[in-house]
């Protein structure tokens, strides 16, 4: 479903900022920095072997098949309705889990700033409150959501710029907190935090989100490739710059997953500095912006699937006044609320553990859908060669196959490291991995039941409608 009233509201600048807001996740910037100098080498590898292929694949699909459903539409064209519904179900419902992770992070920052030692039972109502604030924003008119994503992108640039510059200034006066040597730049399975490499891969996914906003894009054939190029360059540059700043200001064993960004600027400006407080508040607002972006676009794709009878009808409900996917976004709110309660219990009093567990779980679900998304690209190249492609990946079939295999390989590695972050060192922490494995099995099983029942109900409705039609 689309809105003609809202058509053409996002040009190249808005699409660029939307992608920046969607892709840059401040909470995972610290995970990237936790890799130490070896993370810079991993970033270089990821840029060449994942970012560039990913950028070209999304540009070709987004300009060839511009539609409200985004990856749902692409996978449906390639592999059929049921497979596309499985993918978009994971893509969509996992954002309810990510919503919980995001706001666990937000309340952790609030606690660190205003109430150190705030117990989790106090943080939980705040998490739930932020979840339903996000749902209310998404259910309102689309211009508000777009405005929040643009503002969030600007705030992220300010925050990462401040952390990067602040860390470098601190290092100039006091020395570099994290030693940089030739040996430290070489990744190894024994490197501290090597499991966080999955966060680097996740950090550079999400550019395809904007394709779910098909009805509000201005001339996507022209604007989307430009915006994806600009935003890809900005995202990679900001992540590397911010990671460098954090490493220069903090030793690796002092980088906190929840408060690492604000911790990096405290040594320069002081704990009680107004600048630290301003950056902290901007950080909080960015987290809300993250969730609006990551919930708004997939909810549209899920609503499109529900419209075709592949998900429950309630998911396909659109707001009668604002034409927003209120059914899908409200469902995400309930998922996020349930997950917040569960993961607060699992955290056993540690906010950082709660964030990383929920983040790993949601990220595994989200990027699992990419295992169908990338093959859909090569399948459509083979099965639909006659469709005009305003942007076509250069290099012919060989390049298309190589890029697809590279992207699938990186996603597979990220999934393994999210679930088993210590596997490269030969150990498995089942306290971390167990809930993710069980959760994935549960979500996949529930999804299969929901999809098949939705298909049966839709078929029954169509049959009844045909029987009632006068011959």
Give the location of each predicted region.
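Membrane-interface "cap" regions at the ends of multi-pass membrane proteins
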Residues: 1-58, 67-68, 181, 386, ...
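Helix-loop-helix junctions that connect adjacent transmembrane segments
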Residues: 6, 40-41, 117-118, 122, ...
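C-terminal membrane-solvent junction of multi-pass transporters and transport-like membrane proteins
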Residues: 6, 151, 314-323, 367-420
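TM-loop-TM module centered on a large, flexible mid-protein loop between adjacent transmembrane helices
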Residues: 73-74, 80, 112-116, 227-292, ...
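Membrane-interface loop-to-helix entry segments
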Residues: 122-174, 205, 228-233, 359, ...
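A generic transmembrane alpha-helix motif of multi-pass inner-membrane proteins
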Residues: 357, 361-369, 395-471
């Amino acid at each position: 479903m689309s809105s003609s009233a809202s058509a053409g509201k996002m040009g190249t600048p808005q699409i660029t900022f939307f992608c920046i807001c969607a892709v840059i996740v401040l909470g995972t910037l610290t995970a990237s920095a936790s890799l130490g100098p070896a993370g810079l080498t991993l970033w270089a590898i990821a840029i060449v072997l994942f970012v560039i292929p990913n950028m070209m694949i999304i540009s070709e699909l987004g300009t060839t098949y511009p539609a409200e459903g985004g990856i749902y539409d692409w996978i449906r064209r390639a592999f059929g309705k049921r497979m596309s519904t499985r993918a978009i179900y994971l893509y969509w419902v996992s954002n309810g889990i990510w919503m919980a992770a995001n706001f666990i992070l937000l309340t952790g920052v609030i606690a660190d700033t205003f109430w150190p030692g705030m117990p989790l039972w106090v943080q939980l109502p705040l998490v739930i409150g932020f979840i339903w604030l996000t749902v209310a924003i998404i259910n309102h008119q689309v211009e508000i959501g777009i405005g929040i994503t643009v503002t969030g992108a600007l705030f992220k640039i300010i925050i990462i710029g401040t952390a990067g510059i602040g860390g470098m200034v601190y290092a100039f006066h006091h020395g570099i907190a994290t030693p940089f040597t030739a040996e430290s730049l070489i990744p190894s399975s024994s490197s501290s935090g090597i499991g966080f490499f999955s966060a680097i891969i996740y950090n550079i996914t999400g550019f395809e989100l904007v394709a779910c906003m098909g009805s509000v894009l201005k001339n996507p054939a022209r604007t989307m490739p430009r915006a994806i190029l600009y935003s890809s360059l900005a995202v990679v540059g900001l992540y590397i710059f911010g990671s460098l700043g954090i490493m220069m200001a903090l030793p690796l064993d002092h980088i906190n997953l929840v408060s690492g960004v604000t911790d990096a600027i405290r040594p320069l400006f002081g704990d009680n500095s107004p600048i630290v407080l301003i950056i902290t508040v901007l950080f909080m607002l960015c987290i809300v912006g993250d969730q609006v972006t990551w919930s708004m676009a997939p909810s549209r794709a899920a609503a499109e699937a529900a419209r075709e009878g592949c998900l429950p009808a309630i998911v396909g409900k659109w707001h009668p006044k604002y034409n927003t996917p209120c059914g899908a976004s409200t469902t995400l709110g309930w998922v996020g609320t349930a997950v917040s309660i569960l993961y607060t219990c699992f955290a056993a009093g540690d906010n950082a553990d709660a964030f990383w567990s929920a983040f790993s779980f949601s990220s595994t679900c989200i990027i699992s859908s990419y295992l169908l998304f990338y093959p859909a690209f090569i399948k459509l190249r083979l099965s639909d060669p006659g469709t005009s492609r305003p942007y076509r990946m250069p290099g012919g079939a060989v390049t298309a196959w190589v890029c697809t295999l590279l992207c699938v390989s990186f996603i597979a590695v990220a999934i393994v490291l999210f679930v088993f972050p210590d596997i490269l060192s030969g150990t498995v922490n089942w306290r971390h991995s167990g809930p993710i494995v069980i959760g994935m099995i549960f979500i996949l099983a529930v999804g299969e039941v929901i999809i098949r029942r939705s298909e049966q109900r839709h078929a029954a409705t169509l049959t009844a409608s045909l029987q009632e039609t006068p011959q």
